[in-house]
């Protein structure tokens, strides 16, 4: 939301003004400008706060001594500077081998736009902001990176595209997208998720294919607030369904790369002996020949979008029909959007996906 304030400053004696114009979002410094006021003048200024910035626009109204016509406004100064919050927190972000310092709100807005489409419902964006803040605070406390609090890689921490990359992604819609993301961050200011007083591991993913997964089924460690839950309404996700097909020869070679001792002989239609499933409907183990493989192993080996798949052999090829995209643990982003569009708020979304977790406001 844009807030605008108007003020008038009357100058009654000579004075000099020098202004330094800076763009703190892109960390660039422009030029310094000066002007002398040597007679009675009126300086009309508008102060606008938008997208984490404070902008001061000034127009100089010059008196007319030679004519009775009204003086014409002349643009004088535009100042863009970083808004100073009383308790603004920063963190160190590792990006491409270099560490940069970023305001927490700016970093979180970048994460929200990097991880979730700006077209999602506002309450879904707020849920993403809280999850991202919780994840970042937990990573910071954990000391995973020697000289940084977090990194910008989704495979390690959270995706955090630069402002320039986000502009390229959203094009003419960047300003509107940025406003939505920053609003989501600021309307959940300092809120995090905790369980028994400690920050939770607020993991999230794209879409579940109908159900999220127990953490133990994916990572082997039981986490009480990361349980399998039904997550309907995700069918509009681009990667809700997918298929991977491989020849019988490639199927056998891939399994042998996982376990060289696996014995596969005879008709390929009989290679797969059994499949067991997790609480969230994913593949727990698949037994082929005389060996068993985990769903996590198979997902990685065959490049599947998730572990929730069925396997069919037909006409000399194996087909993996896959539902969902991601590890399927924690919050489904498309599920969050579906819940938000039903009229529920971000608090409900977070409590639905992180069972037993509580919203806590940190005192930064």
What residue spans do the PLM features occupy?
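Conserved, single-site charged/polar hotspot
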Residues: 5-364
